[in-house]
Amino acid sequence: MRQALPLVTRQGDRIAIVSGLRTPFARQATAFHGIPAVDLGKMVVGELLARSEIPADAIEQLVFGQVVQMPEAPNIAREIVLGTGMNVHTDAYSVSRACATSFQAVANVAESLMAGTIRAGIAGGADSSSVLPIGVSKALARVLVDVNKARTTRQRLTLFSRLRLRDLLPVPPAVAEYSTGLRMGDTAEQMAKTYGITREQQDALAHRSHQRAAQAWAEGKLAEEVMTTYVPPYKNPFAEDNNIRGASTLADYAKLRPAFDRKHGSVTAANSTPLTDGAAAVILMTESRAKELGLRPLGYLRTYAFTAIDVWQDMLLGPAWSTPLALERAGLTMADLTLFDMHEAFAAQTLANLQLLGSERFAREVLGCAQATGEVDDAKFNVLGGSIAYGHPFAATGARMITQTLHELRRRGGGFGLVTACAAGGLGAAMVLEAE
């Protein structure tokens, strides 16, 4: 085993996560219909600052992410600074790592803290699947550029005459991998077939996710970390995630048809995470800065790991790669964890990763490790449900998981938690958290 690499500043300060907050998550075209991601980001950061009672000028950096990019606001982070009353001199930039985007934002702020260039920052992400950048065809785009340079009406008409009717149709954002043409659901189907994961197993995991999430809301466990939002026409508050199906039964899941491989598949809309709108953010500081401000941190970021694998086959195995690396850097084993939280993009993807974490063969032949990372204890796994139930605004999910896990660790008296996610492009992310 290599030497552990816990995250501390040059002065020995740990990286403190002081607080975290998110909007409720809304299914596509429901409560946040028409609300762009930048406005969702402003909502959550503004409320996070108001609740924390931290002086606005104490925040020296904001790193924020958005996966579904809006051309009119390419640097969502800077727009949030300008739209929330933060100090205009606050450094702000945007990141994107697909479904692990807010993991990356947190890592970037942590690195600034370790470098000593800042003492406090905000990291997070927002996405809207209801406000999409609808584009134009490549043929129309090329003609429009040429028309802009044409000097006469005749030249412009000649250029437009080259277009066919199909060239005028709007082009929605791509849902497939650029390099392979595969949709995420196609990859989930690959994984189900490769690792022998049945439809019944997938439906059971999805049902478990919804039941746990519904119970978490019923017991008031999420009230402190989810804000109440008001959106036009401002008639009704939106305060709870609207995707959770607490009253569903396993029989309900069995009724749905496969969504991707319609003839032989097992991945359905019910055992996959839905398209979702929402935002989430966390405040990070050096441990000494938190003490100066009289703040008790939610917990600490002990370490993290990012990994990448090939995209052609089973590319959503990021957690099986990033988890052992993060544990090694933290100087921990699976047995040391109090909680283990994995992003549920699909039930098939989640179950495949769990299978490989406990596989001696995968550890030896693929990772080059002497032993398996370890079986994940069901009593520690996604104890409050996961993305299948809550939904998945791509750039916000990591910050949701971090905040949720730290609150639950506090309720349990402290300990270590690991949060991990797969991401498009064969990427993986894992972070080890600590609460006292």
From Swiss-Prot:
Keywords: Acyltransferase, Cytoplasm, Fatty acid metabolism, Lipid degradation, Lipid metabolism, Transferase
Location within or outside the cell: Cytoplasm
GO cellular component: cytosol
UniProt catalytic activity: an acyl-CoA + acetyl-CoA = a 3-oxoacyl-CoA + CoA
Matching PANTHER family: ACETYL-COA ACETYLTRANSFERASE, CYTOSOLIC, ACETYL-COA C-ACYLTRANSFERASE
GO biological process: fatty acid beta-oxidation
Family statement: Belongs to the thiolase-like superfamily. Thiolase family.
This enzyme's EC code(s): 2.3.1.16
Active site residues according to the UniProt entry: C99, H392, C422
Top-level EC class: transferase
Pathway linked to the protein: Lipid metabolism; fatty acid beta-oxidation
The protein's name: 3-ketoacyl-CoA thiolase
Domain of life (superkingdom): Bacteria
InterPro entries (alphabetical): Ac-CoA_C-AcTrfase_FadI, Thiolase, Thiolase-like, Thiolase_acyl_enz_int_AS, Thiolase_AS, Thiolase_C, Thiolase_CS, Thiolase_N
MF terms (GO), sorted A to Z: acetyl-CoA C-acetyltransferase activity
Keyword Transport: no
Assembly description: Heterotetramer of two alpha chains (FadJ) and two beta chains (FadI).
UniProt cross-references to Pfam families, sorted A to Z: Thiolase_C, Thiolase_N
Annotated HAMAP family: FadI
Functional summary from the UniProt entry: Catalyzes the final step of fatty acid oxidation in which acetyl-CoA is released and the CoA ester of a fatty acid two carbons shorter is formed.
